[in-house]
Amino acid sequence: MKKNNLKYILFPWIKNTPQKKFSNLSLDSRKLTSKDVFIAIKGTKKDGNDFIFEAVKKRVVAILSETKEKKKHGEINYINNIPILSFFKLSEKISNLAARVYKEPAKTLKIIGVTGTNGKTTVTQLINQWSELLGKKIATMGTLGNGFYNALKTTKNTTSSAIDIQSFLHIAAKKKINLVTMEVSSHGLVQNRVKNIPFYIGIFTNLTQDHLDYHKNMKQYESAKWSFFSQHKIKKIILNANDKYAKKWLRKLSDKYTIAVTIQNEKQKKYSTKWINATGIKYNVNSTDVEFESSWGQGILSTCLIGYFNIQNLLLSFASMLEMNYKLSDLINTSIQLQPILGRMQKFDVFGKPKVIIDYAHTPDALKKALNAIKSYYKKKIWCIFGCGGERDQTKRPLMGSISEKIADRVIITNDNPRNENQNKIIKEIVQGCIKKEKIIIIPNREKAISSTFFKANIDDIIFISGKGHENQQIIKNKIINYSDQKVVIKLLEKKI
């Protein structure tokens, strides 16, 4: 990539910027080179301004330092001939700056952003699968990683940094990809990571309790999600209008192009530009048939995905495909070929052994919906294995304990990612929500919890393992341990018992 000119990148926000050539922007002082510009902003845990001298030692081209004082904006100081430019509300402009560095890649792409508490990964991956089935190559960013369908590189966050996003879009544009799906988290919205991105389609899945350690209350959490539709450029908005928040937003978005997606709730269509409504659902042994009516016509979608909530996810994906002008008949004919997403209601079924389902459900609402979905398909005993993450929203722990105890026949409480929090404290807080303590088994070691349950369960039983989904690591204190629920289950299923 050609070198960038600092003066051009910062115009018109800072006047008298020195003419400096540089290669990249960086938020991480550990990864700096002498060709970079260091962006020093306050993060959730650390403040980049504390690492300015480290950047100076690495002889960076320049440093942009976020200031809280408006009057200091545009001030330029020098240390060892390295300019340090004060920038008021810098974090809000990083997306713009990075877009300039990477030559505005979003302008050549159609970008679909998906936000919501649960379902972001499933919706993006269903769009990816469907596009591939119908002959279109697609790039994606999200929880499972960034990259191209079936070739993803693991990432730390659901929504990458503003700089990494623009870098990825630049790569996608160079490879002549013209469609990108992106999971948009509430953290990503609050931290302005997608601020400069023009979305062709914005999708909302649902809003339920999660991340209250970060957002403090549901009002702030709702505000973060709503900002996606109220403060960002989105050409077409698709809402799960069965959700109570979406119903409210649909009315507030009356001047926008909206698509209301509902299940047995046709009232919402009068508030939207276009609509899809599922009029009937038939659960079969290995599939589900979804009868629908819509602005595009009517028909039946068949799917092998498990659960009512996955019907919602399917319909949201369906709406986005229709909005990208795919033929209704082609989508109907290929819907049955869509496969379950890694770690999302992923079924393991071997003759003569208990059935196992692995899911990422780590919120009260997701756990409840997953367990109810299993109950609607299978009438035998349900064993539920789950834990809660450390250093995360503590208020959901007893709620998840209560939900699991009410729906499952036996509940095995174990570790998730305890991080630096005491594992026994986490487990105790989960148990506080349980009334029927005789249904509860506590096995902190996750692998032992799964294997113990596997050998206790009858072959007709269902073992539901929740919380980690696709993850292949476990965080205990400051150690990251290689661990995968899938690998543990496959190992058990392959054993000759």
Swiss-Prot record:
Enzyme class: ligase
Record key words, sorted: ATP-binding, Cell cycle, Cell division, Cell shape, Cell wall biogenesis/degradation, Cytoplasm, Ligase, Magnesium, Nucleotide-binding, Peptidoglycan synthesis
Residues given in the record as meso-2,6-diaminopimelate binding sites: R392, D416, N417, P418, R419, G467, E471
Motif mapping: Meso-diaminopimelate recognition motif: 416-419
Catalytic activity line of the entry: UDP-N-acetyl-alpha-D-muramoyl-L-alanyl-D-glutamate + meso-2,6-diaminopimelate + ATP = UDP-N-acetyl-alpha-D-muramoyl-L-alanyl-gamma-D-glutamyl-meso-2,6-diaminopimelate + ADP + phosphate + H(+)
Pathway connected to this protein: Cell wall biogenesis; peptidoglycan biosynthesis
Cofactor(s), names only, from the UniProt record: Mg(2+)
GO molecular function, one term: ATP binding
Binding site for UDP-N-acetyl-alpha-D-muramoyl-L-alanyl-D-glutamate: L27, S29, N157, T158, T159, S185, Q191, R193
Alphabetical list of InterPro entries matching this protein: Mur-like_cat_sf (IPR036565), Mur_ligase_C (IPR004101), Mur_ligase_C_dom_sf (IPR036615), Mur_ligase_cen (IPR013221), Mur_ligase_N (IPR000713), MurE/MurF_N (IPR035911), UDP-N-AcMur-Glu-dNH2Pim_ligase (IPR005761)
Post-translational modification as stated in the protein's UniProt record: Carboxylation is probably crucial for Mg(2+) binding and, consequently, for the gamma-phosphate positioning of ATP.
Family per similarity comment: Belongs to the MurCDEF family. MurE subfamily.
Known function: Catalyzes the addition of meso-diaminopimelic acid to the nucleotide precursor UDP-N-acetylmuramoyl-L-alanyl-D-glutamate (UMAG) in the biosynthesis of bacterial cell-wall peptidoglycan.
UniProt name for this protein: UDP-N-acetylmuramoyl-L-alanyl-D-glutamate--2,6-diaminopimelate ligase
UniProt source species: Buchnera aphidicola subsp. Schizaphis graminum (strain Sg)
Protein's gene: murE
